Amino acid sequence: IRRQRQMCIRDRVNDPSVPPNLCFPGKEEVAALVAEITGKKMASVENVTAAVRCSRLDGNVKKQLDYIGYSTCSAAALAYGGPWACKFACLGFGDCVSACPFDAMVLVDGMPQVDPVACVGCGSCVRTCPKGIIELIPSQARVWVPCSNRDSAKAVKAVCEVGCISCRMCVKVCPAKAVTLEEGIIRIDHKKCLDYGTGCDEVCVEKCPQKIFRYYQPAALADKEKRAEAA
């Protein structure tokens, strides 16, 4: 079996259709080596970071039941979707934390927090989350939406104070056309957002009625405040 696995990996690495930059932990150094060994064209490596799209604590999401069982997210998800009234909420048992091979995640008040310095974007947490609410987004992203709820506005407000209500305001005001509503959830084309630059003044954040469209990193907020002072 081990020999077969090695041959499978070798075939994948040598496959011309497979780019040489898929080893996120290895970043550009490993990508360059793979490209050199296989004769493939070097492709840039985008640094990505895990992001948990849930604001259960901010939204004061209540419990729908008291879960008694194995203290894992995978087990809790089988019990009527978990203990929280929002069926898209982070379950809070830390399966993602346990799965992270780089110790880049930790539970704080029952919610996973990501260390952006330690996170290499390997995606182990993404694959582990039974709710599918963890995504990999560019480390330089300016904005994001920490909510995965796909229900109607009425249903969202019944369980969460800050959840996305799919009002499409962000979609309408984004001059870069970087924001879309797909299958009930807001998606951001971060390349379009970053390429457009700060000229939009992050209007998506300002116009969001739920204040769930937020700055992704402190640097983006600091830059916004600096521009406001200079105006």
Model-assigned labels for residue ranges:
Residues 1-9:
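Single conserved hydrophobic/aromatic residue that forms the stacking wall/gate
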Residues 6, 15-16:
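Eukaryotic low-complexity, mixed-charge intrinsically disordered interaction/regulatory segments enriched
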Residues 16-28, 33, 79-80, 117-128, ...:
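Short microdomains enriched in Cys/His and/or Lys/Arg
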Residues 13-14, 38:
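Generic structural signal for hydrophobic core residues of well-folded globular domains
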Residues 4, 192, 212:
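Ca2+-coordinating acidic residues in Ca2+-binding motifs
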Residues 20-98, 102-113, 139-150, 154, ...:
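Fe-S ferredoxin-like electron-transfer domains
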Residues 9-13, 95-113, 120, 124-141, ...:
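Iron-sulfur cluster-binding cysteine motifs and their immediate structural context
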